[in-house]
UniProtKB/Swiss-Prot annotation:
Record bears the keyword Cytoplasm: yes
Cellular component terms per the entry's GO annotation: cytosol
Position of the signal peptide: none
Source species taxonomy: Bacteria, Pseudomonadati, Campylobacterota, Epsilonproteobacteria, Campylobacterales
Protein name per Swiss-Prot or TrEMBL: Translation initiation factor IF-1
Native source species: Campylobacter curvus (strain 525.92)
Annotated ranges, domain S1-like: 1-72
Role this protein plays: One of the essential components for the initiation of protein synthesis. Stabilizes the binding of IF-2 and IF-3 on the 30S subunit to which N-formylmethionyl-tRNA(fMet) subsequently binds. Helps modulate mRNA selection, yielding the 30S pre-initiation complex (PIC). Upon addition of the 50S ribosomal subunit IF-1, IF-2 and IF-3 are released leaving the mature 70S translation initiation complex.
Database matches in CDD domains: S1_IF1 (cd04451)
GO MF term list: ribosome binding; rRNA binding; translation initiation factor activity
UniProt xrefs under PROSITE patterns: S1_IF1_TYPE
Keywords assigned: Cytoplasm, Initiation factor, Protein biosynthesis, RNA-binding, rRNA-binding
HAMAP family: IF_1
Subcellular location: Cytoplasm
Family of the protein in this entry: Belongs to the IF-1 family.
């Protein structure tokens, strides 16, 4: 059930923070805070610094995002 108005962009995880929050450097060199999507938590997908991830941003808040996919 994805929303139509989200912005999807790729990035690299820079730092792991408490409470499943991560600093992610996007391809355009901006660094944002991201949390893990619920489906990724449910399936115990681990995110480590250095991983390449797909991030969803809303047009309302471009400094926070949600990690929806970890590339292999």
């Amino acid at each position: 059930m994805a929303k139509d108005d989200v912005i999807e962009i790729d990035g690299n995880v820079v730092e792991a923070l408490p409470n499943a929050t991560f600093k992610v450097e996007l391809d355009n060199k901006h660094v944002i805070l991201c949390h893990i999507a619920g489906k990724m938590r449910m399936h115990y997908i681990k995110i480590m610094p250095g991983d390449r991830v797909k991030v969803e941003l809303t047009p309302y808040s471009l400094d926070k995002g949600r990690i929806t996919y970890r590339y292999k």
